[in-house]
Amino acid sequence: MQYDIASIIQGYAQGYFLMADDNDCLGWYGSRDRTLIPLDERFRYPKSLQRVLNQERFTVAINRDFAAVVAGCANRESTWISQELQEIYWLLHQTGYAYSFETWQGEELAGGILGIVIGGAFIGESMFYRIPEGSKVAMVKLVERLRQREFVMFDAQMMNPHLERFGAYRIKDKEYKTLLEKALLSSSTLI
């Protein structure tokens, strides 16, 4: 199937995101409230995770195994990442928009975060882990990276209890779109 990458990026740039429904039909979705991961002092994580970080059990990589991260994110009992959406992520990756931020333990992929980068916006699509704490370490290290690269926002789309532990917060759609417009003017890069 042919996909128009420019149209897909335009959809994300307007504040929408792709998801497949229970019948694997792909569609654009929006939200009245959007969840952001703070890139300032509001970002936090459990003290137990600090011990894991201090042990340096994991190394970090970007795009070392993009396909494995997409597969890991999609490999759930109930998933919104259809086969078609996996193909779109691959095309977005090949054109420089989709990234995998990964943690590794030796030669084993421990966890990762799948995201789309447009200007100074990192749009987190999904995350997974194979080794306990793998995705949590990825979250901390990704926030550090986004800060270093002067990103404007880390969009997590929808709130869940896991994200709340990192200081995630909701903003109204109007405020989100204003922040997104600012992010789109930025020339930040992940790599």
UniProtKB/Swiss-Prot annotation:
<keyword id="KW-0012">Acyltransferase</keyword>
<dbReference type="Pfam" id="PF03588">
    <property type="entry name" value="Leu_Phe_trans"/>
</dbReference>
<dbReference type="InterPro" id="IPR042203">
    <property type="entry name" value="Leu/Phe-tRNA_Trfase_C"/>
</dbReference>
<keyword id="KW-0963">Cytoplasm</keyword>
<dbReference type="GO" id="GO:0008914">
    <property type="term" value="F:leucyl-tRNA--protein transferase activity"/>
</dbReference>
<keyword id="KW-0808">Transferase</keyword>
<dbReference type="GO" id="GO:0005737">
    <property type="term" value="C:cytoplasm"/>
</dbReference>
<dbReference type="InterPro" id="IPR016181">
    <property type="entry name" value="Acyl_CoA_acyltransferase"/>
</dbReference>
<dbReference type="InterPro" id="IPR004616">
    <property type="entry name" value="Leu/Phe-tRNA_Trfase"/>
</dbReference>
<comment type="function">
    <text>Functions in the N-end rule pathway of protein degradation where it conjugates Leu, Phe and, less efficiently, Met from aminoacyl-tRNAs to the N-termini of proteins containing an N-terminal arginine or lysine.</text>
</comment>
<protein>
    <recommendedName>
        <fullName>Leucyl/phenylalanyl-tRNA--protein transferase</fullName>
        <ecNumber>2.3.2.6</ecNumber>
    </recommendedName>
</protein>
<dbReference type="GO" id="GO:0030163">
    <property type="term" value="P:protein catabolic process"/>
</dbReference>
<comment type="similarity">
    <text>Belongs to the L/F-transferase family.</text>
</comment>
